[in-house]
A protein has these predicted regions:
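Residue-level recognition of transmembrane alpha-helices
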Residues: 24, 31, 60-63, 107, ...
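Interfacial/gating helices of multi-pass transporter permease domains
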Residues: 45-67, 134-138
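Residue-level signal for short hydrophobic patches within transmembrane helices
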Residues: 17-36, 40, 65-72, 148, ...
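Hydrophobic/aromatic residues within transmembrane alpha-helices of membrane transport systems
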Residues: 29, 41-45, 59, 84, ...
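Small-residue-rich hydrophobic transmembrane alpha-helices
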Residues: 56-116, 153-172
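Short alpha-helical transmembrane segments in multi-pass integral membrane proteins
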Residues: 1-24, 84-151, 189
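Alpha-helical transmembrane segments of multi-pass membrane transporters
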Residues: 118, 171-189
C-alpha cells in the first residue's frame, strides 16, 4: 500500500535565511508567550485579598518543580522530534508513527510517575525548594492543581516539539498562544 503522507521538503531546498525566519520567529514568539503563564498566575494570585504576598511566595516556591516537569516533558518530546524529523526526511512514515506513539506513551508514563512521586512527597519537596510554614499551604494548594494536570502538560510539551519539527512551526506557536490565552481566562475561576 503506497504512503500518501508527505514530509516537508523545504529543509533540503530552501535557503537558511528563509528557514530561520520560518522556524525561529514562531519559536521566539511562542517562548515569549509561554513566559506569560507564570506572570498571569502571579498577577491573579498577588491580588488575593489578605494573603497575596504569602500566596506569591508560595507560587515562587513551586517554579523549580514546574520547570523540572516541563523539562522532562520537553526532553522526551525533543528526542522523539529529532528521530521523527530524520525519519520523515527518509520518508519512513511507518517508523515515524511508531516513534510518535512511543513518545506519547513515554510522556504519559513519565508524567504519571512524576505526579505520583510529587504528590507522595510534596511537602518535603516544597520545603527543599524554600517553602516556609507560612507559605507551604499556598505552594501545596497551587502545586496539587498543577500536578493533577501534569500528564497533559507532558503531552503538550512533547507533542509541540514534534509539531514544530514536522514542518509546522506556526501551528506549534498557535497552540502555545492558545494555551496562554486559555490559562489567562481560567486563572480567575
Amino acid at each position: 500500500m503506497p504512503q500518501t503522507q508527505t514530509a516537508p521538503t523545504e529543509l533540503g531546498s530552501e535557503s537558511i535565511g528563509i528557514l530561520l525566519k520560518k522556524y525561529a520567529v514562531p519559536g521566539i514568539i511562542a517562548m515569549t508567550a509561554s513566559s506569560l503563564y507564570n506572570m498571569v498566575d502571579s498577577i491573579y494570585i498577588g491580588h488575593i485579598p489578605g494573603s497575596g504576598s504569602l500566596a506569591i511566595s508560595g507560587l515562587a516556591v513551586t517554579f523549580p518543580l514546574m520547570n523540572l516537569s516541563t523539562a522532562l516533558g520537553t526532553l522526551v518530546g525533543v528526542g522523539a522530534a529529532t528521530m521523527i524529523s530524520v525519519l520523515l526526511g527518509q520518508r519512513n512514515y511507518k517508523i515515524a508513527n511508531k516513534v510518535l506513539a512511543n513518545e506519547v506513551t513515554l510522556n504519559c508514563i513519565v508524567g504519571l510517575l512524576f505526579t505520583v512521586f510529587c504528590l507522595m512527597f510534596l511537602d518535603p519537596i516544597l520545603y527543599f525548594f524554600g517553602a516556609s510554614a507560612n507559605t507551604l499551604k499556598y505552594a501545596r494548594d497551587y502545586m496539587e492543581i498543577i500536578l493533577y494536570g501534569n500528564v497533559i502538560t507532558h503531552l503538550y510539551f512533547g507533542l509541540n516539539s514534534i509539531i514544530r519539527s514536522s514542518g509546522n512551526p506556526k501551528m506549534a506557536m498557535g497552540l502555545t498562544l492558545f494555551t496562554v490565552i486559555l490559562n489567562s481566562i481560567l486563572d480567575p475561576i
